[in-house]
Curated annotation (Swiss-Prot):
Residues involved in UDP-N-acetyl-alpha-D-glucosamine binding: T11, G12, G13, N123, R164, S185, I239, Q284
Catalytic activity: di-trans,octa-cis-undecaprenyl diphospho-N-acetyl-alpha-D-muramoyl-L-alanyl-D-glutamyl-meso-2,6-diaminopimeloyl-D-alanyl-D-alanine + UDP-N-acetyl-alpha-D-glucosamine = di-trans,octa-cis-undecaprenyl diphospho-[N-acetyl-alpha-D-glucosaminyl-(1->4)]-N-acetyl-alpha-D-muramoyl-L-alanyl-D-glutamyl-meso-2,6-diaminopimeloyl-D-alanyl-D-alanine + UDP + H(+)
Family to which the UniProt record says this protein belongs: Belongs to the glycosyltransferase 28 family. MurG subfamily.
Function comment: Cell wall formation. Catalyzes the transfer of a GlcNAc subunit on undecaprenyl-pyrophosphoryl-MurNAc-pentapeptide (lipid intermediate I) to form undecaprenyl-pyrophosphoryl-MurNAc-(pentapeptide)GlcNAc (lipid intermediate II).
Organism for this UniProt entry: Maridesulfovibrio salexigens (strain ATCC 14822 / DSM 2638 / NCIMB 8403 / VKM B-1763) (Desulfovibrio salexigens)
Protein name: UDP-N-acetylglucosamine--N-acetylmuramyl-(pentapeptide) pyrophosphoryl-undecaprenol N-acetylglucosamine transferase
Top EC class, one word: transferase
A single MF term (Gene Ontology): undecaprenyldiphospho-muramoylpentapeptide beta-N-acetylglucosaminyltransferase activity
InterPro entries linked to this entry: GlcNAc_MurG (IPR006009), Glyco_trans_28_C (IPR007235), GlycoTrans_28_N (IPR004276)
Length: 360
C-alpha cells in the first residue's frame, strides 16, 4: 500500500472517522502517502492539523433532492473534472469515501479510472451519495446493519464507525459532576439555548460543564455562563482535545450523528442524545436509539427540549452515579473500537484483489 486517497467533507462527523482510518493506515504502512480530498468547508483545517495533504473541490449538498438532483447540480461538472485530474495525477492504490457530497466525485472518478474503491456508511439510514456509490465500489463498510437492503450484501461488511484513538483511550465513566456538552463540530443552537436556560438550576446542583458551542454561538453562550456565575473557562467554540474532554466527564449531552454515537460508546460514557430533527430520513434518531434501547442513553426529541427539561434530566442522572456507571458499561458493550483497523485491512484486501487479477 503506497498511496491512498480519503475523501469526504462538510463536518467533523464525516472527517474524524476518515482521520482515524488515516492514522491506522500510517501505523501499518509508515511509508504510505495519504491525500485527503474534501470540500470548501472546515475539513481543510481538521485534515491539515493532522499533518495530511489536502485538496479542495467544489461541493454542495442537495438535501432531499435524490439521485437525479445530484447529477443535475452545476457543481458536479467542475468537481468531476478536478477529481479526475487529481486521481490521475496522484495514482492511488485505492480511494475510500466517507460520505457527504464532497466525497462523491473523487470516488466516482477513481471508479472510472479503474482504481479500487470503497465507501464507509456511518448512519443507520444511508445518504444519497453513498447509495449511488454503493452500486459501483468494491467494498462497502457500514456502521450499522443494513436492514433496508441499501447495499449489495455480498460486498457489505459491518465494522462500526472509526473512532479517534484519544477517545478510545479516554477511560470509562468518571465519578464527577462534570457534564460535556456539544452539538457536533459546528455546534447546535437548540442545545446551547437549552443549556443557558437551565444554568441556574445546574449551578444550584453543583454541576460543572465543559461546553463546545460552535463558532456562531460562542459569545452568546459565554455571556450566559458569565451572567449565571458559571466558569467561562470551560466554554469554547471548538474542543481540540476531545479525549481529555470525554475523560473528565461523567455524562455527555450531544446530538446523535453516527460519529458522536460511536465516540460516546467507545469512551464508555452515558449520554443524553438530542437528535437533529432535520437530518436526512431522521437518521440521528435511529442512531440514538441504538444506545437508548440498550439503556446506555436517554433520548430527548428537540421538540420537547427546554432548559428545565434538560437541567432536570442532567441533575437526576448525575445524582445516581451507580446508574451512570451501568449506562457507561452498556455503552461500552456497543462500542466497535476496531473499526479503523477493519477498514484498513479491508482496503488492503481490495488492493490485493486487483494485483492478483492484474498478474493473472
Amino acid at each position: 500500500m503506497k498511496r491512498i486517497v480519503l475523501t469526504t467533507g462538510g463536518t467533523g462527523g464525516h472527517v474524524f472517522p476518515a482521520l482515524a482510518v488515516a492514522h491506522e493506515i500510517k501505523n501499518r504502512f509508515p511509508q504510505c502517502e495519504i491525500l485527503f480530498i474534501g470540500g470548501k468547508g472546515p475539513e481543510r483545517e481538521m485534515v491539515e492539523r493532522a499533518g495530511i495533504s489536502f485538496k479542495g473541490l467544489p461541493a454542495k449538498g442537495v438535501l432531499g433532492g435524490g439521485i437525479k438532483k445530484v447529477f443535475s447540480s452545476l457543481w458536479i461538472v467542475s468537481a468531476m473534472i478536478m477529481a479526475l485530474k487529481e486521481i490521475a495525477s496522484f495514482k492511488p492504490d485505492a480511494v475510500i469515501g466517507f460520505g457527504g457530497y464532497a466525497g462523491f466525485c473523487p470516488v466516482l472518478a477513481a471508479w472510472l479510472l479503474g482504481v479500487p474503491t470503497a465507501i464507509h456508511e456511518q448512519n443507520s439510514v444511508p445518504g444519497v451519495t453513498n447509495r449511488i456509490l454503493g452500486k459501483v465500489v468494491k467494498r462497502v463498510f457500514a456502521s450499522f446493519e443494513d436492514r433496508n437492503g441499501s447495499f449489495p450484501a455480498a460486498k457489505t461488511v459491518v465494522v462500526g464507525n472509526p473512532v479517534r484513538k484519544e477517545i478510545i483511550d479516554s477511560g470509562n465513566c468518571a465519578d464527577t459532576k462534570t457534564v460535556l456538552v456539544f452539538g457536533g463540530s459546528q455546534g447546535a443552537a437548540a442545545i446551547n439555548d437549552a443549556v443557558i436556560d437551565g444554568l441556574a438550576k445546574l449551578k444550584e446542583a453543583g454541576i460543572s460543564l465543559r461546553h463546545q458551542t460552535g463558532k456562531a454561538d460562542f459569545e452568546k453562550v459565554r455571556k450566559g455562563y458569565e451572567q449565571n456565575g458559571m466558569d467561562t473557562g470551560k466554554v469554547s467554540p471548538f474542543i481540540h482535545n476531545m479525549g481529555e474532554a470525554y475523560a473528565e466527564a461523567s455524562l455527555v449531552v450531544c446530538r446523535a450523528g453516527a460519529s458522536t454515537v460511536f465516540e460516546v460508546a467507545a469512551a464508555g460514557k452515558p449520554a443524553i442524545f438530542i437528535p437533529f430533527p432535520h437530518a436526512t430520513h431522521d437518521h440521528q434518531t435511529g442512531n440514538a436509539r441504538s444506545l437508548a434501547d440498550l439503556g446506555a442513553a436517554e433520548l430527548i426529541p428537540q421538540a420537547e427540549l427546554g432548559g428545565n427539561r434538560l437541567a432536570d434530566e442532567i441533575i437526576k442522572l448525575i445524582a445516581d452515579q451507580d446508574r451512570l456507571k451501568g449506562m457507561g458499561s452498556k455503552a461500552l458493550s456497543f462500542a466497535r473500537t476496531d473499526a479503523a483497523s477493519a477498514i484498513a485491512e479491508g482496503v488492503g484486501d481490495i488492493i490485493r484483489m486487483k494485483t492478483v487479477r492484474g498478474a493473472a
